[in-house]
Every structure is written in C-alpha cells, then in structure tokens.
Design a protein with these regions (language model features):
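Bacterial N-terminal signal peptides
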Residues: 5-14
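Low-complexity, Pro/Ser/Thr- and charge-rich linker/hinge segments at domain boundaries
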Residues: 27-29, 141-166, 175
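N-terminal edge beta-strand
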Residues: 36-63, 153-169
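Aromatic sugar-binding surface patches on proteins
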Residues: 100-107, 217-228
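Surface-exposed, short loops/turns at beta-strand junctions within beta-sandwich domains
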Residues: 110-116, 228-233
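Short acidic/polar inter-strand loop motif in beta-rich domains
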Residues: 125-132, 241-249
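Short beta-strand edge segments in extracellular beta-sheet folds
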Residues: 136-142, 252
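Short amphipathic, basic-aromatic surface patches that mediate peripheral association
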Residues: 179-192
Length: 252
C-alpha cells in the first residue's frame, strides 16, 4: 500500500507543481484576459513570459493587413501548440499552430484588427504549462468589417487557391514564405457569408507532416504565412477552406 501511495503521489506531483506556478503580472493589462484564459486555455496553468515574442507594428496603418510574427524559438523542441488571438476583435481567434520536429516554433502571418487591442500568443510546452506572450497594437479601426478587396477584382474566382511561395536558406534552416489567393470572408460584411481557409498542413517530400495549422477569419485576405524549416528538401502545402475546397502547392 505504501508503494501504491508513493506512485499516486508521484503522478500527482507535476499537476500540483503546475498549479502552484505564479503567473506574474500581465504586461498589457486587459479586462478580457480572464475570459480568454478560461475560453481558450481552459483555465490551465500559465505564466506571462517575455520569451514568447509578438512582433507587430505599434500602429496598424492598414487594419486589414497587419503583419504579425510569433516567435517561441526559445522553447524549440519543447512546443506542443501555439494559440494566437486579438482580444478586442469581434472574431478574436487567429491561428492554432502545431509545429512538428523539423519546424521551429516561429510563424509569420497577416491579420485584421477592428480596433486597438492586446494581441496574445500562448505557447504550450510538453509539461502542459502555457507561456503567454503579449503586445498592444493601436488602430484606426474597421479592419474586420471592411469589404474584401479581392472580390472587387474581375475573375478572382479563377485564381482561388493559387499559391505563390519561395524558400530562403538561412544557415541550417530555410524560411518559407507563401501567399494564398483567397478572400477570407469573415461573415461580418452584409450579404457575404463566411468563406475562409480553415486548415493547412506543411509536409515534406515523403508526406510527413511538418506542421499543422487551424486558421480563423481574423486572418487577412490572400493569407501570407511564413515558417522556419530545418534541413533540406521540397515541401508541400495542403489547404482546405470551410466550403470543402482543397488546394495544394509544392515549394522547392
């Protein structure tokens, strides 16, 4: 019985340790943090962590196309999942990013901002703890409710799902940059229902998954994505939208 009690105690220790973690002070105090902590992280243990870096302009000159970099390379090899959201957006969720062994926990993406808002990226490590990076961005507003520019271009449907991409060697890694032709309609413009890319996978030449992404309507139209991939070899990007359309592109 003593042996069983010790085993049970050992199993409970990690959870007890995580529960005792002091999260620290919110670097961008927000009345919405408690809501999103419960809604997106399930009230799981977390720390505000400067090692999770969010790089965004201090002011969104074009609220429909705001560049954002999420850098969790300080936790390379230990990252399970990366969630990002804009707290005061009407549609806050941005991306659920799950890098595998050869993809570093770094992602670039363009997003829509409706108003000045805290941006968050929560990085879950293998011990179950969430490391939360934060920044503030100011904006004139309207990025989420502005009509699509893509839909004003004649024949845009003929180019739906086309992918432009390139690989840029950087020592032992390569940076992949891709742009996908898609209106990314978020349902907030009158008369235009939701129509957006919601799933993506990055694969190597053998079909092994390098990264999985779930995308949300806060992502800008004609999405831009960037990844850091270790090692050589061709990669393929597989995409699917919420209407069931599937797209594929090879990146040499």
């Amino acid at each position: 019985m003593k042996w069983l009690a010790c085993c049970l105690l050992g199993v409970g220790l990690p959870m007890m340790t995580l529960a005792a973690v002091e999260p620290g002070k919110d670097p961008v105090p927000s009345v919405m943090w408690a809501f999103y902590h419960k809604q997106l992280l399930g009230d799981a243990p977390f720390v505000f962590d400067e090692r999770v870096r969010l790089l965004a302009p201090p002011f969104a000159e074009d609220a429909r196309q705001v560049p954002l970099e999420i850098d969790a390379r300080a936790f390379a090899g230990d990252v399970v999942r990366v969630l990002a959201w804009a707290e005061l957006n009407p549609l806050p969720r941005i991306v659920d990013f799950r890098p595998e062994a050869r993809v570093l926990p770094w992602l670039s993406i363009r997003i829509r901002i409706e108003q000045a808002t805290p941006l968050r990226a929560a990085v879950q490590t293998r011990d179950g703890l969430w490391h939360v990076g934060s920044t503030l961005i100011d904006a004139a507003g309207g990025g989420c409710t502005a009509p699509s520019v893509v839909r004003t271009q004649p024949g845009w449907e003929e180019h739906l799902g086309e992918v432009l991409g390139a690989r840029y060697p950087r020592g032992d890694t390569s940076r992949l940059r891709v742009q996908v032709a898609h209106p990314m309609d978020n349902g907030l413009v009158s008369g235009i229902p939701e129509f957006f890319l919601n799933q993506a996978q990055l694969l190597d030449a053998d079909g092994q998954v390098l990264a999985r992404l779930e995308l949300f309507p806060a992502v800008s139209e004609n999405p831009n994505l960037g990844f850091d991939v270790q090692g050589p070899g061709q990669t393929r990007l597989m995409l699917r939208d919420n209407s069931g359309n599937q797209f594929e592109a090879a990146i040499p």
